[in-house]
């Protein structure tokens, strides 16, 4: 199987044409044509090109963790491109301890029925059947997430077997490429979830960028050796060199709590932002959500980020956690390397 059939631009053009066709049918009022459109999307659902096109539509946006219909409504009002449904926010997962599993399907379904933006949900690393349940439920994307307690300490889900796109976390180039080789359509550069501390996310995107620069400077024979070292197909390494970046959409996640945090991660080269506890563990969730969306979209202009930062109060931010105070066994980022 070829991992990739199209370039980013080609995938984007394909998906936009599909969206334009959908809008034309809707605007025409000729509802008899809608079944034909549904049939068309059904034929292409699950192909490599479509699974990689969905994350492209999220680029430049913010995905927000939610645990209820009310929070999902706030996220949509604030301008989130998608929501991620889970049972507890990462901060609460950390405090509660025990085993963290996927959210109640009834809650996920309620969220899906209450908003118009895409809905994602988390599964435990390696838990094939939690993923199958979410695929049957009809969510838009699955996050095989280190925030939940891993079901398999050694292996991730073989994502090629699913029609639905997956996102996975990574702390370095090797982890990212291994997840892509398993079928991930999107990568999250890992931070330390539930801390409100962006330092680990910063560290890991810098590692990815540094390792990418090293890969680009290698001779071909050295890249062959590197692919063996990273345990990924050589073709995937060559595709990474061709694009001079991870060959899928790469968002930042973990510890992002302010508009400036989001702008920093965009400046460092990510395509968008996941926000976990930073919004709904604050005392000003709607204002903070709007501010982070604004800063993510306008990160190239410091005046816009300043405007976003003025929309919130530091006194209302979530109480952060100094990562240096966490024990090694308390770190979530190390799960699923």
From Swiss-Prot:
Keyword hit for Lyase: yes
Classification via Pfam families: SOR_SNZ (PF01680)
Keyword presence, ATP-binding: no
Enzyme Commission (EC) number: 4.3.3.6
Identification of the protein by name: Pyridoxal 5'-phosphate synthase subunit PdxS
Gene Ontology BP terms: amino acid metabolic process; pyridoxal phosphate biosynthetic process; pyridoxine biosynthetic process
Residues reported to bind D-ribose 5-phosphate: 65, 194, 255, 276-277
Biochemical pathway: Cofactor biosynthesis; pyridoxal 5'-phosphate biosynthesis
HAMAP family in the cross-refs: PdxS
Organism from which the protein derives: Metallosphaera sedula (strain ATCC 51363 / DSM 5348 / JCM 9185 / NBRC 15509 / TH2)
UniProtKB keywords: Lyase, Pyridoxal phosphate, Schiff base
Enzyme active site: 122 (schiff-base intermediate with d-ribose 5-phosphate)
InterPro entries with a match to the protein in the record: Aldolase_TIM, PdxS/SNZ, PdxS/SNZ_N, RibuloseP-bd_barrel
GO function term, MF aspect, one: pyridoxal 5'-phosphate synthase (glutamine hydrolysing) activity
Taxonomic placement: Archaea, Thermoproteota, Thermoprotei, Sulfolobales, Sulfolobaceae
Residues that, per the record, bind D-glyceraldehyde 3-phosphate: 206
Reaction(s) catalysed (UniProt annotation): aldehydo-D-ribose 5-phosphate + D-glyceraldehyde 3-phosphate + L-glutamine = pyridoxal 5'-phosphate + L-glutamate + phosphate + 3 H2O + H(+)
Subunit relationships: In the presence of PdxT, forms a dodecamer of heterodimers.
Free-text function comment from the UniProt entry: Catalyzes the formation of pyridoxal 5'-phosphate from ribose 5-phosphate (RBP), glyceraldehyde 3-phosphate (G3P) and ammonia. The ammonia is provided by the PdxT subunit. Can also use ribulose 5-phosphate and dihydroxyacetone phosphate as substrates, resulting from enzyme-catalyzed isomerization of RBP and G3P, respectively.
Family per similarity comment: Belongs to the PdxS/SNZ family.
């Amino acid at each position: 199987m070829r991992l990739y059939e199209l370039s980013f631009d080609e995938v984007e053009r394909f998906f936009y044409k599909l969206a334009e066709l959908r809008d034309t049918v809707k605007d025409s009022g000729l509802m008899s044509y809608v079944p034909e459109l549904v049939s068309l999307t059904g034929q292409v659902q699950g192909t490599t090109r479509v699974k990689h096109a969905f994350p492209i539509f999220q680029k430049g946006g913010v995905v927000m963790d939610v645990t209820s219909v009310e929070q999902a409504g706030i996220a949509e009002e604030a301008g989130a491109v998608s929501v991620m449904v889970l049972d507890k926010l990462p901060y609460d997962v950390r405090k509660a301890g025990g085993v963290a599993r996927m959210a109640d399907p009834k809650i996920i379904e309620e969220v899906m029925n209450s908003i118009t933006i895409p809905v994602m949900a988390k599964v435990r690393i390696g838990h094939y059947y939690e993923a199958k349940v979410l695929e049957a439920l009809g969510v838009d994307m699955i996050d095989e997430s280190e925030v939940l307690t891993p079901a398999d300490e050694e292996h991730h889900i073989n994502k090629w077997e699913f029609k639905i796109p997956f996102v996975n976390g990574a702390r370095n180039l090797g982890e990212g490429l291994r997840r892509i080789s398993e079928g991930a359509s999107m990568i999250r550069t890992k931070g330390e979830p539930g801390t409100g501390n962006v330092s680990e996310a910063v560290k890991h995107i810098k590692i990815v960028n540094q390792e990418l620069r090293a890969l680009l400077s290698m001779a071909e024979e050295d890249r062959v050796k590197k692919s063996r070292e990273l345990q990924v197909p050589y073709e995937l390494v060559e595709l990474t060199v061709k694009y001079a970046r991870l060959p899928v959409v790469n968002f930042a996640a973990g510890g992002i709590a302010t508009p400036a945090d989001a702008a920093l991660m965009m400046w460092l080269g990510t395509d968008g932002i996941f926000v976990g506890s930073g919004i709904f563990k604050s005392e000003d969730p709607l204002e903070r959500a709007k501010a982070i969306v604004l800063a993510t979209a306008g990160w190239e202009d410091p005046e816009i980020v300043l405007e976003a930062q003025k929309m919130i109060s530091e006194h209302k931010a979530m109480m952060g956690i100094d990562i240096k105070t966490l024990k090694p066994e308390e770190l979530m980022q190390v799960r699923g390397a």
